[in-house]
């Protein structure tokens, strides 16, 4: 009954939005709908049985692999006992397909289903995940890979979906954060304050029990078979709730070719940075000889690591440690400053500037945008068909990976340093006490979430809406009442 009421309340608003925003017409022949099952998944982590979520197709295929130019036509079936919805992170979709409960749709009730249908306009590495409650912490997520039919394919593709795991329920973690029980934990730094001006950087709020790659720890890592001479495309997805990662591909030479699904001019290295919510595509070539090649990700501010192993057929598989030899520090802007988009925005002066102040208080665990806590917000309003500059000013001692739904944006400036042809993103990391400027075109009308992708920062209030002028707003009070 409750879900019927919610759907009824949303119907009028969503119909009006669609009339104004317009629905994108199919660009390719429709295919038979793919069925995506949201289900409970039991696994063993550090010797203990743990129940998580998983999104897979009836034949066991994890997530979704599509082709640019075709239709995404999927029926999501909720086989759990919790309401949910699925957001297609990084994809530019019609607003009513964005998968945000109470904003673009009612939640999918237990035993219910929802049909998503939209054209695939992009290619690259994306991911799908719940936007309901704290379900991302329990791995309600999956890869979403879109191939480009015109792109030269690698010999092999390997997905690494990185996650942070706790034996505690996410609701308990958040309650402890709200009551200050984790406030002094800080693996990597000092105490956060309201203004952040006189405090040392804070790297971690949550003490995790393990980091996982594709649901597995390094005690039992996935072994991927490769052959000498293979070109392997590593698709890294930071599907973690709160953990930024350093990527280490060891003895292999990597070439980063895409960030957030968007092509970049190649950057060669064997170490990369990957903030929460971002994706990174790295090419590696397997040398001659029989050998195993660990591909590792170490959590920012910790010695904990995760990963998998690439191995030739006769290679000896090494045993891997979950603890690195040393603790790593904080992510920085070095990598971002090097990234250059293959297809940057066409030069155009912004017609509007939006100031996005990021504030927070670690003791009360309240996180705000322009001093507003979700859902008690005044949306950032834009006008269709304009170039918009968005200025993120982080006034806290924590980094915030800021994600804008339904759009891609270009990084144009970091701490006063202009960047020509900066990388195109849907998620950008804004470091403590720093400023990042981005630009995007308002070419996708609707109401779009914009939030920190640190799960407990988002839950603590660091979320808002970008509203296109003339598009009716959903009833935001319902998001709070129904969530409570």
Label the model's feature ranges:
Residues 1-9:
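Bacterial N-terminal signal peptides that target proteins for export
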Residues 8-18:
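Bacterial N-terminal signal peptides
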Residues 24-35, 39, 140-180, 264-397, ...:
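Extended terminal and domain-junction accessory segments
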Residues 76-80, 236-240, 392-396:
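Asparagine-centered strand-capping/turn motif at beta-strand->loop junctions
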Residues 50, 59-66, 72, 88-122, ...:
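Extracytoplasmic beta-sandwich strand-turn segments characteristic of Greek-key/jelly-roll folds
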Residues 42-68, 208-227, 359-387:
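N-terminal edge beta-strand
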Residues 159-230, 237:
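Acidic-aromatic/histidine active-site loop/patch
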Residues 112-161:
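Hydrophobic or amphipathic alpha-helical targeting/insertion segments
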């Amino acid at each position: 009954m409750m879900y019927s009421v919610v759907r009824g309340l949303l119907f009028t608003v969503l119909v009006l939005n669609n009339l104004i925003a317009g629905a994108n017409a199919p660009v390719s022949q429709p295919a038979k709908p793919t069925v995506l099952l949201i289900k409970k998944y039991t696994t063993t982590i550090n010797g203990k049985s743990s129940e998580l979520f998983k999104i897979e197709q009836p034949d066991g295929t994890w997530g979704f692999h599509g082709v640019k130019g075709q239709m995404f036509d999927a029926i999501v079936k909720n086989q759990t006992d919790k309401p949910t919805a699925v957001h297609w992170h990084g994809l530019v979709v019609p607003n009513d397909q964005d998968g945000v409960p109470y904003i673009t749709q009612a939640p999918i009730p237990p035993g219910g289903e929802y049909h998503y249908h939209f054209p695939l306009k992009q290619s690259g590495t994306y991911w799908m995940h719940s936007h309901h409650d704290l379900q991302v912490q329990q791995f309600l997520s999956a890869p979403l890979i879109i191939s480009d039919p015109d792109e030269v394919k690698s010999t092999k593709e390997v997905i690494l979906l990185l996650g942070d795991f706790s034996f505690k329920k996410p609701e308990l973690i958040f309650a402890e954060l709200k009551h200050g029980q984790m406030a002094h934990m800080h693996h990597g730094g000092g105490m956060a304050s309201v203004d952040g001006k006189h405090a040392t950087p804070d790297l971690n709020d949550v003490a995790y029990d393990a980091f996982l790659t594709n649901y597995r720890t390094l005690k039992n890592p996935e072994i991927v078979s490769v052959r000498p001479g293979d070109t392997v495309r590593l698709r890294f997805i930071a599907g973690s709730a709160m953990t930024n990662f350093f990527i280490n591909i060891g003895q292999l030479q990597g070439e980063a070719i895409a960030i957030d699904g968007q092509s970049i001019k190649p950057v060669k290295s064997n170490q990369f940075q990957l903030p929460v919510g971002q994706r990174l595509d790295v090419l590696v070539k397997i040398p001659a000889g029989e050998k195993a090649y660990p591909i590792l990700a170490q959590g920012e501010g910790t010695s904990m690591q995760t990963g998998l192993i690439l191995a030739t057929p006769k290679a000896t598989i090494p045993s891997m440690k979950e603890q690195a030899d040393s603790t790593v520090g904080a992510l920085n802007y070095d990598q971002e400053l090097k990234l250059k988009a293959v297809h940057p925005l066409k030069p155009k002066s912004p017609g509007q500037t939006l100031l996005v102040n990021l504030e927070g208080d670690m003791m009360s665990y309240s996180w705000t945008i322009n001093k507003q806590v979700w859902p008690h917000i005044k949306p950032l309003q834009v006008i269709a068909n304009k170039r918009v500059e968005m200025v993120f000013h982080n006034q806290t001692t924590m980094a915030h990976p800021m994600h804008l739904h339904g759009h891609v944006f270009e990084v144009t400036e970091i701490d006063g340093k202009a960047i020509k042809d900066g990388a195109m993103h849907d998620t950008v990391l804004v470091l403590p006490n720093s400023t990042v400027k981005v630009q995007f075109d308002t070419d996708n009308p609707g109401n779009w979430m914009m939030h920190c992708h640190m799960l407990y920062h988002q839950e603590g209030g660091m979320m808002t809406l970008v509203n296109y002028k003339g598009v009716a707003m959903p009833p935001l009070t319902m998001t709070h009442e129904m969530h409570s």
